[in-house]
Amino acid sequence: MLKLLSEIGPVIAFFAGFFYGGGIQSATLYMLITSIICITLCYIIDKKVSKLSIISSTVLFVSGIITLISGDSMYIKIKPTILYVIFGIIFLMSGIRKNPFIKYALESIVRLKEESWIILSYRTAAFFFFMAVVNEVVWRNFSDETWVKFKVFGVIPITFIFILLQLPLLLKNKLPDSKI
């Protein structure tokens, strides 16, 4: 539950900051503060922070601070694109190397045949590259308000749909001792 909260908490803070705090600058500040709180809580409670969270937070802090200093919202808007491309490369390379990163992230929940992990890595890489393109299209062609709404009401459902579309692969190729 804490992991989920640490992922969506900053997004909710960004949304609230944009609509109730006065725009992208406020939203960015709220998201940075919430991210620091969430990472700190994760570390205090779990005694660790995942590598993906460290990557996400680093990109967030760099793009967020540049946005706040420069007053240019472009930097916070390209943050998702940068993250999606980084994650896409990580999952693609781990599939190519036959050492799927996604296996380490999900193995406690589901156990699959090795070739299924590789397929899932490629699909996840494709998903992240797709999301990078979608983010670029939305922020470059629509208003700040539309982009912020997309981050909350578009990205989450698209991600959920992607996960649902992976269920047939997971269910067909799970090992007998799998939890799902």
Swiss-Prot record:
Signal peptide: none annotated. It holds the Pfam family IspA. The chain crosses the membrane at residues 4-24, 25-45, 49-69, 76-96, 118-138, 150-170. It is found in: Cell inner membrane. InterPro entries: YciB. Keywords: Cell inner membrane, Cell membrane, Membrane, Transmembrane, Transmembrane helix. Plays a role in cell envelope biogenesis, maintenance of cell envelope integrity and membrane homeostasis. HAMAP family: YciB. Belongs to the YciB family. This is Inner membrane-spanning protein YciB. It comes from Rickettsia typhi (strain ATCC VR-144 / Wilmington).
